[in-house]
């Protein structure tokens, strides 16, 4: 037996969750249920969670419900609730969301998380931020408020001579670089409280950048340090200025500033490193090497105990420099994990490695210290650093509690302020119940809240209690979930008796109708025990007489009323966003327009189901500025799309070879990830042939009449001209011109430069057909005709500004092809020599029929157009679509790029675009498995997304010049206001037909009555009134027709073989039979 | 007595126990599979000692891992031994193989700061299944032809299918490869003609595939015109051909002592060989292109030896028609390699213990249990069985029966993935063997990348590793108890038929008939019932009380029965009123025997259900008065409680089912005292309890 002396009292601590975020953003917390001084047994409940009460899983409320229709607000299972549920917070839930921000590098520098945002200096926007630029704990934030301040440099830093820089630093001069405010702000529609902030001072992948940086700047650094060391240390101003400069230079500032304090052992390490760098002390280097060697060894052991031994040794070595005098949390930088970086050291030179080592220890490890110590301390094993009591001291403090930060603030302040690279900030939002929320009971009786009524308007019980919720009585019979009625009535009894019931399902073991008899007996005892006789009326068991809250009148019939357990369901709204990112462009009749600039007035290229191209106005444009989620990115040689996961792609199964558009379907992107699918790039352009007429001009006071052109010839001519021609006024007759008799008189010259034989051949054919004569000289074809000149002159712009005239869009598909091919002939020869060789070869060997596919490919590759005009490039890709093909725009050469041509260096003055025309392979396949040129990925994304909806549901879009058909935003059409369900087939022209349940009700009411109503009242009422208005409006003589029901009646009677008819009296009172079907 | 009634097993036990099993045996088993790793000269060998593996404590606890966006995992260390036979050195070292994600107490994993659940997958258990296939002969769908197939389902590796097609030809089928005549396949597996035809009761049935080949008319003429011997054979052939229509002929043939069946068959194919050779001579061009033989693709060459069969198999799967004397050997070698790779290599094909057990049982074989790959005997006996099934002597299997379906728990899935990771590691090590210079050290060979990569892949992309549904504790718990037929190795939701989605009699007490999602996943994603458990074999078991002479033996405890064991038992429902002494009521009692409901006297009853809740899932058992609800609505009711948002103030339901407490406690969301004691401190942050512990 143990005596009382041998009893040990051990405290066991249970830490509780406080508003943790769950995967679905609901909150998780613990609510203690025990009181101090209570005795608990093992297994007893200590604390509830967010969805339990007294250890019982409970997620809802027992509320007073009645099954009654209320002004039609119960339509389609909708629910009517009392405002009490809102104001008493009965259905209020807390949702916790996490927002992340991290700094990134752009060409001008690294972003910075700071409160120091110049642009907002004079506003109140920064008031709630702490000095690091992060919203303070507990701050109540609204939409648009800054969560984390961040600035992005937008201008590269100017290189300043080093002495100037030093001068600036010493005098504390700050150079303001251009920055942009890129703060994280509270998204739309959110009003929430900051409940947790986590800062991350380091990022793994950054270490490498650091290395480079250190390497680059080491000279400057050394210089500064040397400078400093030679000066008096008490010069605080200077050290500070130096510090600030370093802050800009490297993130090592934390280090340097620490160094100034001279209390930390780190300083000495650092100093030592620097010395070595400057003077290469051989002795010390050796020592350090020893230390490193030790580290290498020790890192391979995983036993902590062993590590600890090494540690002591290691520290002893370091104490040579300086032992810590005071508590310094930074001391723990020398932690076991540091050694894991061993591999890095090996790669680096000793000098570099030293710096790096110190740096890594700071960056990587300072955060882990707490948790590590904590673990050790709590386990009660040998303390990790037995000789330093502060280890356990730090360890005991909870890592995440702000108090710990508080303690450490002095030492780690600069660390924090300058090193934060990413912040997680948690916002807790209170969501009260509102219209549109989904609620449900436990029997599958779900509905959407349609109206919130003031409690005085709700129907009330005989004792005056207003009901909380009105459910549709039609929701019970057809659904056959009678359990809800039992529950509701037993709830009523339980509420009045103050009892709770736990009933296992399948209680038939206790006799037939066990549930019903139990419920009624409980109701009865509630009546007898409370003395409230209305609770149970034998005539209407389970039903109560309710009173209308608005009038105080009793309802006609007794109503099922009782307490039911109702729950609030999460809403899944993300389903509704199907969009693209802003870098997509949409094809409209006004050219390619960025997605965010499209208006409903634009005509957007859409695709009919039969594959025909039609221009339509978008019906709606969607803009979600704060989308947060994942995007689907598909990139291929021929297509490039970046869309939300539920954006619908216009694809078909990859294996199907047929070119028809029948197999294409709109499938959400998330469902085709990784699948072999084919996209579509072309359309059929159904247009009549266009006839171009050259407008008339006045020449020498003679009107030259309009000229109808031969389209084939004209298109060929025009195509070549727009590519390589110009029109000019030849005012001074120069020698060249005089040489050509025919045109010497005319100053209006249209010229085409000929570089290819083929082009000359074509023009030789074409120009005579058009009725012009031409000269060929010096690789130029010259036509002198004023009419032609007058038309072409305005189009004859400099190369970068060229575009196609509007009539081009009226061309038929074949005509568009002719024009396009004509334009391309100009470039064909040069780029196509390979193909032509192959073609000639194959024709010689008469193998052309053997390799048609091969040849086609060649053609595809060959058809390209080159231009420096952005507009023309866009026009051509549109023309390609009209031609039943498609065009991909590539930026061939950037402005300012240099290429050599014939040994000469040529600098591009403009961007050069290449438009490659795809004729046959317009169904780019993805994931076909032949080769892996394409890219398909799902990326996290935060930012704006856009979309539009068009009647045809499919529109033409391109990203990076690669165009493709894709689905529009939303197709399910309008949503019912009450039930929030898509109307789909139930709506026509905005009207809404009867709901499913209402139809059942009508069936019960009697189809005969309905028929009667429709035939008599409704039909005559509407049509009669319409016709009368018609007559009134158009001032016709009034004529009142026969009621429809009357017609029906006559037809019925005629069907019974009765001789019956409608007769109309003439002016002369002669009766004339009227045919029933022709009656007005 | 009363406590028995309220006994309900822990709800997330399934996940925890499975992970425990993984740590105890699965991990060791998987490591052992890779042991030892040797280089090609066999002078270097790496041997792991998996039994002594150690896990370092995780850096973060599961809660911190979520906050820091880290993975809740621990490092796996295994002692490794490097034997250098050249230098006669043995080195020994602990090596780190990788990070193993740990399951939290609540039964989920934390990967990159997000709680993830690995849901249990129901797959067809490894073994052999016979099934019937119905073909429409004409388009009017009036005349159906019944054909049969046997399917070898492996735990890992390709599924082999022996099937009889519309034309009664027998094939061996594999996914993504053209089908192969079964004779080829059997010969290719290593059987000889003699064994093959002697061990089958109807050897000629196998030759059916070639009968059409023999039909070529001019052969008969040719043969006849040759000499007497040939004419005789031709006659035999004719008779054989007729025999498929009329079996009496063959009987008479059998009876006449000249023609033993085997002889007959031998004759037939020897004739075929001679014919073919001749033909090759006659039409060298045609045979080279293979045109003649492939007029109808179905007509294959006959193979008389394994070598020939392998040649043919390889030419078939690679779709090369030309077999010349030059590439003959190569083809045979490749064919052999192919078959070995697909079915004989323990690294790529694995029946699993249960697969071997079930095969042995079904085919009455006695192969050793360590034989985890397919053998030629398996296929041979399966062929024999298939032919018997065709004759109607044996029945087909019901693939929807739960005895034929197994649950792959989270541990099985992780174990498989670790297997993949270790395979990569092994490959890595092997390649390092070839590049080493001097005296290697153990650490040089090991890297954590292969294993970590494989696990990361699994947790990140596998559809069975899901983002945990944490809306409320019920959602979390049902997520962990979910059973799905989807995912790799399962069915796809587009091709799933109604049969798979439907309820099967064996679901009783194992899979909830109510709780399943609405929509396209209906019936494919299921929920485990409250009392069910998954045994180490992956079969779902449900408890019953033993009934002895009409008395329910409650004190004898639960008898957990799997679907197979339950098949023959007579089971009474759980909601019967018992007498005080535990006897069933007198008179006829409604009982169930597999799929029929009858009434029997109490003395015939074998078992009684434990509770009415036994047949429904956790979420469903939260619905009060469930028996009064239509099943569709009960389904919605069960599903919607999972979507309920925790409220700032919620209430206990006035009407409940009594299982609410268990849900709260088993979900691990509420805190329960680990030991008794005095509450010393309570705040929103922590609770401190002073426990008295006596020192001994």
Swiss-Prot record, chain A:
One of its GO terms (cellular component) is DNA-directed RNA polymerase complex. GO terms for biological process: DNA-templated transcription. Gene3D superfamilies: 2.40.50.100, 2.40.50.150, DNA-directed RNA polymerase, subunit 2, domain 6 (2.40.270.10), Hedgehog/Intein (Hint) domain (2.170.16.10), Homing endonucleases (3.10.28.10), RNA polymerase alpha subunit dimerisation domain (3.90.1800.10). PROSITE patterns: RNA_POL_BETA (PS01166). It catalyses: RNA(n) + a ribonucleoside 5'-triphosphate = RNA(n+1) + diphosphate. Disulfide bonds: none annotated. Coiled coil: none annotated. InterPro entries: DNA-dir_RNA_pol_su2, DNA-dir_RNAP_su2_dom, DNA-dir_RNAP_su2_hyb_sf, Hint_dom_sf, Homing_endonucl, RNA_pol_bsu_CS, RNA_pol_Rpb2_7, RNA_pol_RPB2_OB-fold. Its EC number is 2.7.7.6. Pfam families: RNA_pol_Rpb2_6, RNA_pol_Rpb2_7. It is found in: Plastid, Chloroplast. Keywords: Chloroplast, DNA-directed RNA polymerase, Nucleotidyltransferase, Plastid, Transcription, Transferase. Its main location: plastid. GO terms for molecular function: DNA binding; DNA-directed RNA polymerase activity; ribonucleoside binding. In plastids the minimal PEP RNA polymerase catalytic core is composed of four subunits: alpha, beta, beta', and beta''. When a (nuclear-encoded) sigma factor is associated with the core the holoenzyme is formed, which can initiate transcription. DNA-dependent RNA polymerase catalyzes the transcription of DNA into RNA using the four ribonucleoside triphosphates as substrates. In S.helveticum the gene for this protein is split in two. Belongs to the RNA polymerase beta chain family. This is DNA-directed RNA polymerase subunit beta C-terminal section. It comes from Stigeoclonium helveticum (Green alga).
From Swiss-Prot, chain B:
The keyword Nucleotide-binding does not apply. This is DNA-directed RNA polymerase subunit beta N-terminal section. It is found in: Plastid, Chloroplast. It catalyses: RNA(n) + a ribonucleoside 5'-triphosphate = RNA(n+1) + diphosphate. The gene is rpoB1. Transmembrane segments: none annotated. One of its GO terms (molecular function) is ribonucleoside binding. It is an enzyme of class 2 (transferase). DNA-dependent RNA polymerase catalyzes the transcription of DNA into RNA using the four ribonucleoside triphosphates as substrates. The lineage of its organism: Eukaryota, Viridiplantae, Chlorophyta, core chlorophytes, Chlorophyceae. Belongs to the RNA polymerase beta chain family. In plastids the minimal PEP RNA polymerase catalytic core is composed of four subunits: alpha, beta, beta', and beta''. When a (nuclear-encoded) sigma factor is associated with the core the holoenzyme is formed, which can initiate transcription. Its EC number is 2.7.7.6. It comes from Stigeoclonium helveticum (Green alga). Keywords: Chloroplast, DNA-directed RNA polymerase, Nucleotidyltransferase, Plastid, Transcription, Transferase. The keyword Transferase applies.
